A protein has these predicted regions:
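Sigma70-family region 2
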Residues: 41, 54-69, 89
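Internal acidic/polar
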Residues: 4-6, 92-117, 150
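N-terminal module of bacterial RNA polymerase sigma factors
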Residues: 1-31, 38
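Arg/Lys-rich amphipathic alpha helix in sigma70-family domain 2
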Residues: 63-65, 79-96, 168
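Hydrophobic-face residues of short alpha-helical interaction/recognition segments
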Residues: 32, 36, 61, 74, ...
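Structural recognition of an alpha-helix C-terminal capping motif at a helix-to-coil junction
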Residues: 48-55, 68-80
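Amphipathic, Lys/Arg- and hydrophobic-enriched alpha-helical face
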Residues: 25-43, 60, 127, 176-179
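DNA-recognition helix of helix-turn-helix
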Residues: 83, 134, 140, 149, ...
Length: 180
């Protein structure tokens, strides 16, 4: 924790800020990319959202209160940016977020950055049927292998509530996979 506080101090100090922010990007670019990609599913869109996420992190570092881990705070920003991006994209297209997500899933097979097979496409279709919060919880637990405590910090939900949502999501996905 002391090490994180020192790093945050470097991020806020004008003399060390650039070097510290470069380290932050190097350390967190891959996990944040993967997290955002799990939400928006498209490589190019993920790159755009990731860039916006780092801009927002940089702009808001002075407001970071240290009530959660830096990692959790950045994940929360990335999650909000990804969800906002999807809502804006759906609004621009004049369709619902669910319809947009189904279109993106249909395009996954043509995405050169997606190396999944038929089963993974089916899994993504099942996930798309879940409510937004269950999707997030499932993806963070299943794909990113985050602990419930970390997800709780990121989403601001109790661990018990997360476990229940994850369990319900798993049951819905199992039912979809069995019937399709």
């Amino acid at each position: 924790m002391q090490e994180e506080q020192e790093f945050i101090a470097q991020l806020l100090n004008l003399k060390t800020q650039n070097q510290a922010f470069q380290k932050l990007i190097v350390d967190y670019q891959r996990p944040l990319y993967n997290h955002i990609r799990n939400i928006v599913l498209n490589h190019d869109d993920t790159d755009d959202v990731l860039q916006n996420t780092f801009i927002k992190i940089f702009q808001n570092l002075k407001n970071f209160k240290g009530e959660s881990k830096l990692f959790s705070w950045m994940y929360r920003i990335a999650t909000n940016e990804a969800l906002s991006f999807l809502k804006q994209k759906a609004k621009k297209s004049g369709i619902s977020s669910e319809t947009l997500q189904n279109k993106v899933i249909d395009n996954l097979e043509a995405d050169i950055f997606f190396d999944g097979n038929e089963i993974q496409i089916k899994l993504q279709k099942a996930i798309a049927l879940l409510p937004e919060k269950q999707q997030l919880i499932f993806k963070m637990k299943y794909f990113e292998e985050l602990k419930y405590e970390a997800i709780s910090e990121i989403l601001g939900t109790s661990v018990g509530g997360l476990k229940a949502s994850y369990h319900i999501a798993v049951k819905k996905i199992e039912a979809f996979v069995k019937t399709n």
